[in-house]
Regions:
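Conserved functional micro-motifs across diverse proteins
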Residues: 1-203
């Protein structure tokens, strides 16, 4: 039995030895981060020519977030039932400016926020799709686009990314204090370079 465990350990070590960690390219808020030919998971991804600048960030309650964008659940519809595990309690909103520097249109080139995370050493926060649609005024018929888009050549657009967490949730509990104290990174790509922006509250 011990020999099997030892052999398994050696096998895992040999496999991992051949995996190179991506080079981390660090940006700060206010810096324009060009994505280049880097990707998240799929070689068919094409974000070349696009750049992202994190302009501002803030933490607020779910209720304050809805109030900010004029959404009334009694009139406009309930977004999350009380027992929904994805119901946010707190929002870490990051405002970004996206630019397309390409001079010609390319239908295969664009950005998807489905892979965007705010990452720390021991937790990560995801974008809430319903809150993203509200903040960015996405029409209902376009909400199946899964937060993917492309910009016209040589154009730019601002977006609000609502990363959510729920301190009171037994499943995904992370405290507000933990989030505020963490070294948070907005990851823009994973391979071959991990390009990321350090996020700090500005308000």
């Amino acid at each position: 039995m011990l020999s099997l465990v030892l052999l398994l350990g050696i096998r895992i070590w040999m496999v991992n030895r051949g995996i190179e960690s991506p080079e981390v390219v660090q940006f700060e808020m206010g810096e324009e981060a060009e994505i280049g030919r880097n990707i998240f998971n799929d070689r068919v991804e094409n974000m070349n020519g696009y750049s992202v600048t994190a302009e501002s960030a803030r933490i607020m309650t779910y209720e304050d977030y809805l109030k900010k964008y004029g959404y009334n659940e009694e009139e406009d519809g309930v977004l999350f039932e009380e027992d929904n595990m994805l119901r946010p309690e707190m929002i870490y909103e990051v405002d970004i400016l996206v630019k397309n520097h390409n001079k010609e249109d390319n239908t295969g080139c664009g950005i998807s926020y489905s892979d965007y995370k705010l990452t720390a050493s021991d937790f990560m926060l995801s974008v809430s799709s319903p809150l993203y649609w509200i903040a960015n005024d996405i029409a209902e018929e376009n909400q199946n686009l899964m937060m993917s888009f492309r910009l016209r050549p040589e154009s730019e657009m601002r977006f609000h990314l609502p990363f959510y967490f729920a301190p009171g949730s037994p499943a995904e509990s992370v405290s507000e204090e933990t989030v505020r104290d963490a070294d948070l990174q907005l990851v823009l790509s994973l391979y071959p370079e991990q390009r990321q922006i350090r996020i700090d509250e500005t308000e």
